[in-house]
Amino acid sequence: MNNVLVLKSSISGNNSQTNQLADYVIEKLQGNHIVVRDLAQQPLPYFDTVAAIAVRGEPKTTEEKQLLALSDELIEELKNAQTLIIGAPMYNLNIPTQLKSYFDFIARPRVTFQYTAKGPEGLLKGKKAIVLCAFGGLYDEENLVTQYMKSILGFIGITDVQFVYAQGIGLGAEAIEKAQSSAKNKINELITSL
Protein backbone atom coordinates (compact mmCIF):
# COMPACT_ATOMS: atom_id res chain seq x y z
CA MET A 1 0.00 0.00 0.00
CA ASN A 2 1.25 3.44 -0.99
CA ASN A 3 0.86 6.57 1.17
CA VAL A 4 -0.46 9.32 -1.09
CA LEU A 5 -0.85 13.03 -0.31
CA VAL A 6 -3.19 14.90 -2.65
CA LEU A 7 -3.00 18.70 -2.68
CA LYS A 8 -5.86 20.58 -4.32
CA SER A 9 -5.43 24.31 -4.84
CA SER A 10 -8.11 25.43 -7.28
CA ILE A 11 -10.62 28.05 -6.14
CA SER A 12 -13.16 26.70 -8.67
CA GLY A 13 -14.36 23.79 -6.52
CA ASN A 14 -16.13 21.04 -8.43
CA ASN A 15 -15.92 23.06 -11.66
CA SER A 16 -12.13 22.93 -11.54
CA GLN A 17 -10.43 20.85 -14.20
CA THR A 18 -7.48 20.14 -11.87
CA ASN A 19 -9.82 19.11 -9.03
CA GLN A 20 -11.61 16.77 -11.44
CA LEU A 21 -8.28 15.26 -12.43
CA ALA A 22 -7.24 14.95 -8.78
CA ASP A 23 -10.53 13.18 -8.01
CA TYR A 24 -9.87 10.85 -10.96
CA VAL A 25 -6.45 9.98 -9.48
CA ILE A 26 -8.01 9.40 -6.05
CA GLU A 27 -10.57 7.05 -7.62
CA LYS A 28 -7.84 5.14 -9.47
CA LEU A 29 -5.68 4.82 -6.33
CA GLN A 30 -8.38 3.39 -4.05
CA GLY A 31 -6.82 0.80 -1.76
CA ASN A 32 -3.91 3.09 -0.95
CA HIS A 33 -3.73 5.33 2.11
CA ILE A 34 -4.79 8.71 0.72
CA VAL A 35 -4.73 12.06 2.53
CA VAL A 36 -6.43 14.95 0.72
CA ARG A 37 -5.67 18.55 1.64
CA ASP A 38 -7.80 21.12 -0.18
CA LEU A 39 -5.86 24.35 0.14
CA ALA A 40 -8.69 26.40 -1.37
CA GLN A 41 -11.48 25.03 0.82
CA GLN A 42 -9.29 25.15 3.94
CA PRO A 43 -6.74 27.86 3.14
CA LEU A 44 -3.54 28.24 5.08
CA PRO A 45 -2.79 31.57 6.71
CA TYR A 46 -0.94 34.09 4.58
CA PHE A 47 2.81 33.60 5.04
CA ASP A 48 3.80 36.89 6.64
CA THR A 49 6.48 38.18 9.01
CA VAL A 50 4.95 36.37 11.99
CA ALA A 51 4.89 33.07 10.08
CA ALA A 52 8.47 33.55 8.88
CA ILE A 53 9.64 34.15 12.46
CA ALA A 54 7.68 31.13 13.65
CA VAL A 55 9.10 28.61 11.18
CA ARG A 56 12.64 29.94 10.98
CA GLY A 57 13.42 30.89 14.54
CA GLU A 58 12.30 30.35 18.08
CA PRO A 59 8.57 31.08 18.34
CA LYS A 60 7.71 33.13 21.39
CA THR A 61 4.09 34.24 21.03
CA THR A 62 1.04 31.98 20.98
CA GLU A 63 0.43 32.89 17.33
CA GLU A 64 4.01 32.00 16.38
CA LYS A 65 3.74 28.66 18.20
CA GLN A 66 0.48 27.87 16.39
CA LEU A 67 2.06 28.66 13.02
CA LEU A 68 5.07 26.47 13.81
CA ALA A 69 2.71 23.64 14.81
CA LEU A 70 0.88 24.07 11.48
CA SER A 71 4.17 23.94 9.58
CA ASP A 72 5.17 20.81 11.50
CA GLU A 73 1.81 19.18 10.68
CA LEU A 74 2.13 19.94 6.96
CA ILE A 75 5.71 18.65 6.86
CA GLU A 76 4.77 15.47 8.72
CA GLU A 77 2.00 14.79 6.16
CA LEU A 78 4.50 15.31 3.37
CA LYS A 79 7.18 13.15 4.99
CA ASN A 80 4.69 10.30 5.46
CA ALA A 81 3.70 10.33 1.79
CA GLN A 82 5.54 8.24 -0.77
CA THR A 83 3.62 9.88 -3.60
CA LEU A 84 2.49 13.47 -3.92
CA ILE A 85 -0.35 14.46 -6.27
CA ILE A 86 -0.60 18.22 -6.78
CA GLY A 87 -3.41 20.06 -8.52
CA ALA A 88 -1.69 23.17 -9.90
CA PRO A 89 -3.91 25.22 -12.21
CA MET A 90 -2.51 28.29 -13.91
CA TYR A 91 -3.83 31.60 -12.60
CA ASN A 92 -2.45 34.67 -14.34
CA LEU A 93 0.56 32.67 -15.56
CA ASN A 94 1.45 31.20 -12.14
CA ILE A 95 0.28 28.82 -9.41
CA PRO A 96 -2.56 29.77 -7.04
CA THR A 97 -1.56 31.72 -3.93
CA GLN A 98 -2.99 28.92 -1.80
CA LEU A 99 -0.40 26.52 -3.20
CA LYS A 100 2.41 29.06 -2.84
CA SER A 101 1.51 29.48 0.86
CA TYR A 102 1.76 25.71 1.29
CA PHE A 103 5.30 25.68 -0.06
CA ASP A 104 6.21 28.66 2.11
CA PHE A 105 5.14 26.70 5.20
CA ILE A 106 6.93 23.46 4.27
CA ALA A 107 10.21 24.83 2.87
CA ARG A 108 12.13 24.93 6.15
CA PRO A 109 15.90 25.05 6.56
CA ARG A 110 17.34 21.96 8.29
CA VAL A 111 13.93 20.27 8.06
CA THR A 112 13.03 19.89 4.36
CA PHE A 113 16.22 21.36 2.88
CA GLN A 114 19.66 22.42 3.98
CA TYR A 115 22.32 24.75 2.71
CA THR A 116 25.67 23.22 1.77
CA ALA A 117 28.89 24.47 0.20
CA LYS A 118 27.50 23.18 -3.13
CA GLY A 119 24.17 24.98 -2.70
CA PRO A 120 20.80 23.96 -1.29
CA GLU A 121 20.10 20.26 -0.82
CA GLY A 122 16.59 18.84 -0.49
CA LEU A 123 15.98 16.46 2.39
CA LEU A 124 12.75 14.78 1.19
CA LYS A 125 14.38 12.36 -1.23
CA GLY A 126 12.87 9.16 -2.62
CA LYS A 127 9.37 10.51 -3.23
CA LYS A 128 7.40 10.72 -6.46
CA ALA A 129 5.22 13.63 -7.52
CA ILE A 130 2.58 13.98 -10.20
CA VAL A 131 1.58 17.57 -10.93
CA LEU A 132 -1.82 18.07 -12.55
CA CYS A 133 -1.93 21.31 -14.55
CA ALA A 134 -4.94 22.90 -16.22
CA PHE A 135 -4.34 25.82 -18.55
CA GLY A 136 -6.93 27.95 -20.34
CA GLY A 137 -4.59 28.36 -23.30
CA LEU A 138 -1.82 26.35 -24.90
CA TYR A 139 1.64 26.60 -23.33
CA ASP A 140 4.99 24.88 -23.75
CA GLU A 141 6.97 23.33 -20.89
CA GLU A 142 8.75 26.63 -20.25
CA ASN A 143 5.61 28.05 -18.62
CA LEU A 144 5.97 29.45 -15.10
CA VAL A 145 3.81 26.80 -13.43
CA THR A 146 5.95 23.93 -14.70
CA GLN A 147 9.22 25.72 -13.99
CA TYR A 148 8.20 26.75 -10.47
CA MET A 149 6.88 23.30 -9.57
CA LYS A 150 10.07 21.60 -10.81
CA SER A 151 12.18 24.11 -8.89
CA ILE A 152 10.34 24.06 -5.56
CA LEU A 153 9.94 20.28 -5.51
CA GLY A 154 13.61 19.80 -6.40
CA PHE A 155 14.55 22.33 -3.73
CA ILE A 156 13.04 20.07 -1.06
CA GLY A 157 14.47 16.90 -2.63
CA ILE A 158 11.60 15.61 -4.79
CA THR A 159 13.13 15.14 -8.23
CA ASP A 160 10.96 12.32 -9.62
CA VAL A 161 8.28 14.69 -10.94
CA GLN A 162 5.85 13.99 -13.76
CA PHE A 163 3.42 16.51 -15.25
CA VAL A 164 -0.07 15.94 -16.61
CA TYR A 165 -1.46 18.79 -18.70
CA ALA A 166 -5.07 19.66 -19.53
CA GLN A 167 -4.45 22.51 -21.96
CA GLY A 168 -6.75 24.78 -23.91
CA ILE A 169 -9.68 24.47 -21.51
CA GLY A 170 -10.60 28.08 -22.20
CA LEU A 171 -11.29 27.22 -25.83
CA GLY A 172 -14.72 25.63 -25.29
CA ALA A 173 -16.48 22.40 -24.38
CA GLU A 174 -14.88 20.29 -27.10
CA ALA A 175 -11.40 21.43 -26.05
CA ILE A 176 -12.18 20.63 -22.41
CA GLU A 177 -13.33 17.13 -23.32
CA LYS A 178 -10.21 16.54 -25.41
CA ALA A 179 -7.91 17.93 -22.69
CA GLN A 180 -9.53 15.83 -19.97
CA SER A 181 -9.35 12.67 -22.07
CA SER A 182 -5.68 13.23 -22.87
CA ALA A 183 -4.87 14.01 -19.24
CA LYS A 184 -6.68 10.91 -17.95
CA ASN A 185 -4.78 8.72 -20.42
CA LYS A 186 -1.50 10.16 -19.11
CA ILE A 187 -2.64 9.61 -15.50
CA ASN A 188 -3.44 5.98 -16.31
CA GLU A 189 0.10 5.53 -17.65
CA LEU A 190 1.72 7.17 -14.63
CA ILE A 191 -0.18 5.45 -11.84
CA THR A 192 0.86 2.00 -13.03
CA SER A 193 4.36 2.80 -11.72
CA LEU A 194 3.20 3.86 -8.25
From Swiss-Prot:
Key words of the record: Flavoprotein, FMN, NAD, Oxidoreductase
Which domain of life, per UniProt? Bacteria
In its keyword annotation, does this UniProt entry include Plastid?
Answer: no
Q: Which Pfam families match?
A: Flavodoxin_2
UniProt binding sites for FMN = S10, M90, Y91, N92, L93
Cofactor(s) in the UniProt record: FMN
**Which pairs of Cys residues are joined through disulfide bonds in the record?**
none
* Gene3D superfamilies, per the entry: 3.40.50.360
State its Enzyme Commission number(s).
Answer: 1.6.5.-, 1.7.1.17
Q: Name one GO molecular function term.
A: electron transfer activity
Keyword flag Flavoprotein:
yes
- What is the uppermost EC class here? oxidoreductase
Q: Family membership, please give it.
A: Belongs to the azoreductase type 1 family.
- Subunit structure and binding partners: Homodimer.
Q: What is this protein's function? A: Quinone reductase that provides resistance to thiol-specific stress caused by electrophilic quinones.
What is the official name of this protein in its record? FMN-dependent NADH:quinone oxidoreductase
Please tell me the species this chain comes from.
Haemophilus influenzae (strain PittEE)
